[in-house]
Regions:
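Transmembrane alpha-helices and immediately adjacent membrane-cytoplasm interface residues
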Residues: 8-10, 20-44
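A phosphate-binding catalytic loop at a beta-strand-loop-alpha-helix junction
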Residues: 154-168
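Reductase modules of NAD(P)H-dependent flavoproteins
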Residues: 1-12, 30-33, 96, 120-122, ...
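Short, well-ordered alpha-helices that flank and scaffold nucleotide-derived cofactor binding pockets
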Residues: 167-178, 278, 282, 286
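Short, conserved phosphate/pyrophosphate- and ester-handling motifs at nucleotide-, phospho-/glycolipid
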Residues: 83, 161, 273
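Conserved beta-strand elements of the Class I
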Residues: 152-156, 267-269
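Ferredoxin-reductase
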Residues: 44-137, 152-154, 176-184, 192-194, ...
């Protein structure tokens, strides 16, 4: 963009002759150059975060790994809500911090994030990440809170956008386990009671999870595991290398128990590429689905 502004300034004499336009374009070019210098060279020194060390690397798919990290000092681990993400920087490996969703269950003294190759920096990080690597983590950020949804929910994820939902499912299981531990008794009956208490606490009734991947079924086995474990969850996984992603209307039509003409009380939670989220948000809203919750990776 900076080069385009510079080219327009040099190639268009009227811009140089008009004092106001010349000043505006000059400031834009200088601002762009400063942003590039900061992102390419200075950000790695300015970026502040908790120092951590990689203690585990697990391959999820050909382009996706899950890394486990622990604090490299005595400072307590900064844990966020399920579904939030952190900004991770690997000095000497990538130029600056990148957002990755935290997928570790609450109550653990480790942090886990999933990394999928989506550009040069993530490719380098995917190839070089290993046990013992030092990283910096800042955050958590984000406001993807499923508690804002209605009891009848439709979850839609694409690609690495599955990670916030994995985090929530792990968190729900940990909440159930915590109630069982507090009871002092472990049995299938106690687990059923604890599960119902957690579901009532979260305001959940029925959830249909739609996961679209492009030949990268990261966490697919785990999703089926949660489907078997949670009676309120039904999982639908589609490979977009074999067929196109369903439209919003098709998702509603193929979701058991939903009537496209009567969607009162149905909410949707969406995470994935921005264009996908915008399209599904628009189309689901036009069908009467409300509220629609999505993660826009906002730093708040």
């Amino acid at each position: 963009v900076t080069l385009l502004f510079a080219h327009a300034y040099l190639a268009c004499p009227p811009l140089r002759q008009d004092p106001l336009l010349a000043t505006v374009f000059s400031l834009l070019v200088v601002f762009g150059v400063c942003c590039w210098i900061y992102a390419s060279f200075l950000q790695r020194f300015v970026f502040k975060g908790q120092r951590m060390v990689v203690t585990g690397v697990r391959s999820l798919a050909s382009k996706t790994v899950e890394i486990t990290m622990e604090p490299s000092d005595d400072k307590p681990l900064h844990k966020g809500r399920p579904g939030q993400y952190v900004a991770l920087s690997a000095p000497g490996v990538v130029n600056g911090p990148h957002p990755f969703t935290e997928v570790s269950a609450p109550g653990r003294d480790v942090m886990q994030v999933a990394i999928k190759v989506s550009g040069i920096d993530t490719r380098v990080l995917r190839e070089k990440v290993g046990v013992g690597m030092e990283v910096k983590v800042r955050g958590p950020y984000g406001d993807l809170d499923l508690r804002r949804a209605t009891p009848r929910q439709v979850w839609i994820a694409a690609g690495i956008g599955i990670t916030p939902f994995v985090a929530w499912l792990r968190a729900i299981d940990e909440l159930i386990n915590e109630k069982i531990r507090r009871s002092g008794v472990s049995s299938s009956k106690i687990r059923k009671v604890a599960s119902q208490e957690v579901i009532d606490q979260l305001g959940l009734d029925t959830v249909d999870m739609w996961f679209f991947h492009h030949g990268e079924p990261a966490y697919a086995e785990e999703l089926y595991y949660w489907e078997d474990r949670f009676s309120w969850l039904e999982v639908h996984i589609r490979d977009t290398t074999e067929s196109e992603r369903q439209s919003a209307a098709e998702i509603i039509a193929e979701t058991p128990g939903l009537d496209i003409d009567h969607l009162d009380g149905v909410s949707a939670v969406i995470c994935g590429p921005k264009t996908m989220m915008r399209r599904y948000s628009r189309d689901l809203r036009s069908l009467g689905v409300h509220p629609i919750i999505r993660e826009d990776f906002s730093f708040r």
